[in-house]
């Protein structure tokens, strides 16, 4: 891991139930439309003033056929843009679409966190914007 990351304010957040919740009140959304941003959480995030917000999520419903992967990707893109804009930070996300608990990308395993740091934050930190 890059030494420059030690000086960065990076926040990892879970998606469902933390950053968003269903409008219907059900545990699982009825469709991609059944969600609302949790502004109480977003306001708390703004106070932390992170440079990066990295969203992680288990989405086993994709593997089970309950959730369409393309529709979920569009929903996630909207969430990333909305949160990044509202919290004024770089926002990225990654999800695991399997229910296999031994998958290194499935939370609580750490590969998804490591990959987000390597692919987004570390690349950004190492970019030479002057040349």
Regions found by a protein language model. Give the residues of each.
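Substrate-recognition element of Asp-dependent hydrolases with the DxDx(T/V) motif
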Residues: 41-76, 90-102
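Two-metal-ion acidic nuclease core segments, chiefly of the RNase H-like superfamily
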Residues: 75-93, 111-118
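Short, function-defining helix-loop hinge/capping sites that tune catalysis or transport
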Residues: 22-24, 66, 117
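Conserved Lys-Pro-Asp/Glu-containing loop-to-beta segment of HAD-superfamily phosphomonoesterases
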Residues: 10, 105-131
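Active-site neighborhood of HAD-like aspartate-dependent phosphohydrolases
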Residues: 1-54
């Amino acid at each position: 891991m890059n030494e420059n990351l030690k000086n960065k304010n990076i926040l990892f957040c879970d998606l469902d139930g933390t950053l968003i919740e269903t409008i219907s009140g059900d545990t699982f959304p009825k469709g991609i439309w059944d969600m609302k941003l949790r502004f109480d959480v977003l306001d708390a995030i703004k106070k932390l003033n992170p440079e990066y917000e990295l969203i992680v999520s288990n989405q086993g419903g994709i593997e089970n056929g309950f959730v369409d992967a393309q529709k979920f990707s569009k929903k996630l893109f909207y969430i990333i843009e909305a949160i990044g804009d509202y919290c004024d930070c770089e926002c990225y996300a990654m999800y695991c679409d399997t229910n296999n608990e031994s998958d290194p990308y499935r939370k609580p395993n750490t590969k998804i966190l490591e990959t987000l740091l390597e692919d987004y934050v570390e690349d950004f930190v190492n970019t030479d914007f002057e040349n």
